[in-house]
Amino acid sequence: MAKYNDKELAETSKFLSFVLRHKPEAIGIVLDREGWADIDKLILCAQKAGKRLTRALLDTVVATSDKKRFSYSSDGTCIRAVQGHSTSQVAIAFIEKTPPQFLYHGTASRFLDEIKKQGLIAGERHYVHLSADEATARKVGARHGSPVILTVKAQEMAKRGIPFWQAENGVWLTSTVAVEFLEW
């Protein structure tokens, strides 16, 4: 595996998140319904857009991402973001799963007033993202400011018929979380 510095890996990961989750049209690629993009086309279009992207750099980002944001198809010709999509091109058919008793959501304290009014909503994404442990939720919340960890009564939600899914990187997904299922 080629050697890349942390800044280069982080910038490439952010770029891939942007085009594979939100705006594939920004560089002229098309994702299929499961979010897959042809790797050769991705590299070519990224390079035309002025990004230094190679297969070796992709391999390193996929292999070293602590959150396992991206995955390759079984034949190695396509790549996708595992979850976090906002583009209407993608509708990954996640398998419904029974959640643990509690899941966690990390957010910034400045968002609490709105959450107390409306609960957790997906916003521009397709799903609300939840973590299986508080440490991961804390990292997520810290990206937006002073982190606050909310406990989600996931099993109680599931017992009321609210579905949950789990992405291949372990992130739990649901459509919304009503205020009644949150502990502050």
Swiss-Prot record:
Top-level taxon of origin: Bacteria
Species this protein is from: Escherichia coli O6:K15:H31 (strain 536 / UPEC)
Classification of source organism: Bacteria, Pseudomonadati, Pseudomonadota, Gammaproteobacteria, Enterobacterales
Enzyme class, UniProt record, top EC level: transferase
GO BP annotation list: tRNA splicing, via endonucleolytic cleavage and ligation
UniProt xrefs under InterPro entries: Ptrans_KptA/Tpt1, RNA_2'-PTrans_C, RNA_2'-PTrans_KptA, RNA_2'-PTrans_N
Cross-referenced NCBIfam families: PRK00819.1-1 (NF002012), PRK00819.1-4 (NF002014)
Entry protein name: Probable RNA 2'-phosphotransferase
Entry coiled-coil feature ranges: none
